[in-house]
Design a protein with these regions (language model features):
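Predominantly a core beta-strand signature of beta-propeller blades
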Residues: 51-55, 109-112, 148-150
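Residue-level marker for isolated small/hydroxyl-bearing positions within beta-strands
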Residues: 20, 78, 135, 173-177, ...
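Beta-rich, blade/repeat-based domains predominating
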Residues: 1-17, 24, 38-43, 56-74, ...
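Short coil turn/linker residues within repeat-based beta-strand modules
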Residues: 49-51, 103, 146-148, 187
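Short loop/turn segments immediately following beta-strands, especially the blade-tip
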Residues: 98-106, 185-190
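Blade-level signature of beta-propeller repeat domains, shared across WD40, Kelch, NHL, RCC1
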Residues: 161-190
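A short loop-to-beta-strand structural motif that recurs across blades of beta-propeller domains
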Residues: 43-45, 95-97, 139-141, 179
Length: 190
């Protein structure tokens, strides 16, 4: 069957590929081409080392960004279900969930890790000590490995994603509505 609209991807050190596949890329022509889902839902998939595609999670409203912890024992996945165009429905999901990754690369749901306000989480990255740098509508929010909001990088427009780069991985690149921003940090990303 045809995938919906693969959104975000991460590769684990064992070669497995993990990605989110929400419906919103096919709901209108705005982000893709409007069409009917052949899968009938929103999923998180893993491509195993034999190139087989497997569903690893099927209970997200709108699965979005994802990233592993530095030791790859945990996988974080954003749910941006509260987002409807430029509107937010706060009763819908706007959080990041945390999963334990088992020895066989299956997921054990540990529940909501952190709620993102204002806006919804989209893409995010992790630094070398496990802090999450997540997009929100007005900034990059920095979340500790314990799920606490420990900082914010203000951006003058809506933020969609971020990643670490540069030769030392201490530059955080941030995509926003109309520009690409970068900021040097004292810590490196993974």
């Amino acid at each position: 069957k045809k995938l919906n609209s693969p959104n975000d991807v991460v590769v684990k050190s064992d070669g497995t590929i993990w990605f989110t596949d929400p419906l919103y890329g096919i709901m209108t022509n705005e982000e893709g081409f409007k069409s009917k889902s052949e899968l009938g839902g929103n999923y998180v998939f893993r491509v195993n080392t034999k190139n087989q595609v497997e569903i690893v999670c099927n209970d997200f409203d709108k699965p979005n960004g994802l990233a592993f912890s530095p030791d790859e024992n945990f996988l974080y996945i954003a749910d941006s279900g509260a987002s409807f165009g430029e509107k937010i429905h706060p009763e819908r999901p706007h959080h990041i969930r945390k999963f334990k990754v088992t020895r066989n690369n299956y997921l054990e749901d540990l529940g909501v890790f952190t709620v993102i306000n204002p806006g919804v989480p989209d893409g995010f990255s992790v630094d070398s000590i496990g802090n999450i740098y997540t997009s929100s509508w007005d900034s990059i929010q920095i979340i500790s490995p314990l799920g606490e909001n420990i900082g914010k990088i203000e951006i003058p427009e809506k933020v969609s994603n971020c990643c670490f780069g540069g030769s030392d991985k201490k530059t955080l690149y941030i995509t926003a509505s109309s520009r690409l921003y970068s900021i040097r940090l004292k810590i490196n990303g993974i």
